[in-house]
Amino acid sequence: MSTTWFVGADWLAEHIDDPEIQIIDARMASPGQEDRNVAQEYLNGHIPGAVFFDIEALSDHTSPLPHMLPRPETFAVAMRELGVNQDKHLIVYDEGNLFSAPRAWWMLRTFGVEKVSILGGGLAGWQRDDLLLEEGAVELPEGEFNAAFNPEAVVKVTDVLLASHENTAQIIDARPAARFNAEVDEPRPGLRRGHIPGALNVPWTELVREGELKTTDELDAIFFGRGVSYDKPIIVSCGSGVTAAVVLLALATLDVPNVKLYDGAWSEWGARADLPVEPVK
């Protein structure tokens, strides 16, 4: 495992009563799991003291696109209501697949939180170590949170179109190869098959082992093998902006600079007939 942005279950168990630590449960249903009630799953059992960071609820509901970043003031109010304090060390976890914790990690950092770590192995790893869970909601006093949005963290569709057309940045697509190569339909209806012209495919699952990032040597080999250069700006994308954060986390672990996330992702690009797509049918 690469450890730059991670803490282990043993460390968290030792520090769980530290008043400067706050734990955030960011489990999330993936496309095709719409029948899951992750809020109820959280209530049924979570790491002691963890509040539920509902990525769906914390998205911009004025946008037709899924999981878009909310307005900074909206996010700040939600964090204060959860009892989250931006000056504390926030520990984020998901169910143990590293699917959604990186998105929560990225959101918190994009809105100005400096100390954010991910629990390696997530909830599954915590349970494998026979550590205790608690049930029910966690009620905390109102938190202190004033969002300081970093506009450099995210790009819009016009930025991606320019990067694709002018080759000013590399575009990395985190979706599975079959979706990237237009071999299967997207899980969300109404989207075209294929990928942004010029994009490189680095499926997020190839970067992960048992809910943790692979070693830095392994990550380097994967990125280099897919043609990624660390010397050029990078835009990460995926289906809806969630698993792109896994790629961004891996690149951050490798100290790669100038990496931004395309929040609209394929949910936006694939829905627009006026944007180019590869492979051309």
Swiss-Prot record:
Keyword set, alphabetical order: Cytoplasm, Repeat, Transferase
CDD domains, A to Z: TST_Repeat_1, TST_Repeat_2
EC number: 2.8.1.2
InterPro entries: Rhodanese-like_dom, Rhodanese-like_dom_sf, Thiosulphate_STrfase_CS, TST/MPST-like
Example GO BP: response to antibiotic
Gene Ontology molecular functions: 3-mercaptopyruvate sulfurtransferase activity; thiosulfate-cyanide sulfurtransferase activity
Catalytic activity: 2-oxo-3-sulfanylpropanoate + [thioredoxin]-dithiol = [thioredoxin]-disulfide + hydrogen sulfide + pyruvate + H(+)
One family name in Pfam for this protein: Rhodanese
Residue ranges occupied by any Rhodanese domain in the UniProt entry: 17-135, 165-278
GO cellular component annotations of the record: cytosol
Transmembrane segments: none
Coiled coil feature spans: none
Keyword Repeat: yes
Binding-site residues, substrate: 179
Active site positions: 238 (cysteine persulfide intermediate)
Region of interest called Substrate specificity, as start-end residue ranges on this chain: 238-244
Highest taxon of the lineage: Bacteria
Predominant localisation class: cytoplasm
Locations listed in the record: Cytoplasm
Domain comment in the entry: The N-terminal region is the non-catalytic domain; the C-terminus contains the active-site cysteine residue and the CGSGVTA motif probably responsible for substrate specificity.
Subunit structure: Monomer.
Function summary: Catalyzes the transfer of sulfur from 3-mercaptopyruvate to a thiol-containing acceptor to form an intramolecular disulfide releasing hydrogen sulfide and pyruvate. May be involved in the enhancement of bacterial growth inhibition by serine.
Name listed for the protein in its UniProt record: 3-mercaptopyruvate sulfurtransferase
Originating organism: Escherichia coli (strain K12)
